[in-house]
């Protein structure tokens, strides 16, 4: 089936978070991002969302660099020759080094359009089978431990299946001890966002007594070797996040023994197709995966739901309800969580309608690219 895209619209949005979100590398009060719309010759739209932040804390990509890459390189490549399947895009985009989040935003929009043209949900187009998915919640660093415990209590009461707590040096062992004392049976994990080095191995070993599901990305964001040295020293499984940017990174991590779990983020690895390839590799190796979050708005959240329907997404992901982050999301209906579960939508494409009124409200500026102008 030919995918005849006539034009692409890039929109720069800014949305206010309901509460500040703090990690070991910074605090977010607003989220800027690029919303990508691709429109075919029949006027059908597909939607994608860039997950890059406005500053290069998580990776080298930012909203501004993503816009530049999309405008100058990726959109022209999309229009450069006929397209029959979204899985062709990774090879087409391979001439552009890195810039995975920009690639994923455009590829995701094409996947949404492709599924709509087939008349099937995006999850089905990807090979997913689940009708509902288990989700957890990620909680940023709080002003005090009491504040953290209150936030956790609220989300446990709402039925979330897993609690993730951000840690950093000085906010780690004692904090996790207090959390575990207050919530002895809650599935719990810690996310370090690369805040430690191998010199901190004993401090990280001290977390073993708390029965954590995993510790996420304790060491450097580009490291596999030191994680392979650290993992045998810990009872707690290491989960890699920032270190895994491709199928090859995942293969090397598994070969080295750098981790026992992998967090898959669509934007970080360059798109849905690469995410699926990593999922399939981990399934073959018996390594569970889960879907991480990047403070996505509704479109990105919908893509996360779709990929999580693949069988080896065996652990609850970070795809919390829209209301966890936003007063008003950009999709209808908004993503809702009931007893720790999200029901997977069965409408074609991402399964949610984009609320153009809300998109307009949050849009700072936009630009349209027509096939004939870029071909």
Curated annotation (Swiss-Prot):
pH dependence: Optimum pH is 8.0.
Cofactor or coenzyme needed: a divalent metal cation
Keywords: Isomerase, Lyase, Magnesium, Menaquinone biosynthesis, Metal-binding
Catalytic machinery residues: 166, 265
Domain of life: Bacteria
CC cofactor note: Shows highest activity in vitro with Co(2+), Mn(2+) and Ni(2+).
Signal peptide boundaries: none
Pathway(s) where this gene product acts: Quinol/quinone metabolism; 1,4-dihydroxy-2-naphthoate biosynthesis; 1,4-dihydroxy-2-naphthoate from chorismate: step 4/7; Quinol/quinone metabolism; menaquinone biosynthesis
Binding site for Mg(2+): 191, 216, 241
Assembly mode: Homotetramer.
HAMAP family xref list: MenC_2 (MF_01933)
Entry-linked PANTHER family: O-SUCCINYLBENZOATE SYNTHASE, O-SUCCINYLBENZOATE SYNTHASE-RELATED
Record function comment: Converts 2-succinyl-6-hydroxy-2,4-cyclohexadiene-1-carboxylate (SHCHC) to 2-succinylbenzoate (OSB). Also acts as a N-succinylamino acid racemase (NSAR) that catalyzes the racemization of various N-succinylamino acids, including N-succinyl-alanine and N-succinyl-phenylalanine. Can catalyze the racemization of a broad range of N-acylamino acids, including N-acetyl-methionine, N-acetyl-phenylalanine, N-carbamoyl-methionine, N-formyl-D-methionine, N-formyl-D-norleucine and N-carbamoyl-D-norleucine.
Official protein name in the record: o-succinylbenzoate synthase
Organism for this UniProt entry: Geobacillus kaustophilus
High-level lineage: Bacteria, Bacillati, Bacillota, Bacilli, Bacillales
Gene it is expressed from: menC
């Amino acid at each position: 089936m030919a995918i005849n895209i006539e034009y692409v619209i890039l929109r720069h949005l800014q949305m206010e978070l309901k509460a500040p979100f703090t990690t070991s590398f910074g605090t977010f009060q607003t989220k800027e991002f690029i919303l990508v719309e691709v429109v075919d010759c029949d006027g059908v739209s597909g939607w994608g969302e860039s997950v890059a932040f406005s500053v290069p804390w998580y990776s080298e990509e930012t909203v501004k660099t993503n816009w530049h890459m999309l405008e100058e390189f990726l959109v022209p490549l999309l229009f450069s020759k006929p397209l029959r399947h979204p899985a062709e895009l990774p090879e087409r985009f391979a001439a552009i080094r890195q810039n995975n989040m920009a690639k994923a935003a455009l590829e995701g929009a094409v996947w949404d359009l492709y599924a709509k043209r087939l008349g099937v949900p995006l999850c089905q187009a990807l090979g997913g089978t689940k009708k509902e998915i288990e989700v957890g919640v990620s909680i940023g660093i709080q002003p005090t431990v009491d504040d953290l415990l209150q936030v956790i209590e609220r989300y446990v009461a709402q039925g979330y299946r897993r609690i993730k707590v951000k840690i950093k040096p000085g906010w780690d062992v004692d904090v996790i001890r207090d959390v575990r004392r207050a919530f002895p049976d809650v599935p719990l994990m810690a996310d370090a966002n690369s805040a430690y080095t191998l010199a901190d191995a004993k401090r990280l070993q001290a977390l073993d007594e708390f029965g954590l599901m995993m510790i996420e990305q304790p060491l450097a964001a580009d490291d596999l070797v030191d994680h392979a040295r650290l993992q045998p020293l810990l009872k707690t499984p290491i989960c890699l996040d920032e270190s895994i940017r491709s199928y090859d990174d995942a293969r090397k991590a598994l070969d080295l023994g750098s981790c026992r779990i992998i967090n898959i983020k669509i934007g970080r690895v360059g798109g849905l197709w690469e995410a699926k390839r990593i999922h399939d590799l981990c399934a073959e190796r018996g390594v569970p995966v889960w879907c991480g979050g990047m403070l996505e708005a509704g479109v990105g959240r919908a893509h996360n739901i779709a990929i999580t329907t693949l069988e080896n997404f065996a652990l609850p992901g970070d795809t919390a309800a829209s209301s966890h982050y936003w007063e008003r999301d950009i999709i209808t209906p908004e993503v809702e969580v009931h007893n720790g579960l999200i029901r997977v939508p069965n409408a074609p494409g991402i399964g949610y309608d984009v609320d153009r009124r809300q998109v307009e409200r949050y849009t700072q500026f936009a630009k349209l690219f027509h096939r004939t102008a870029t071909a």
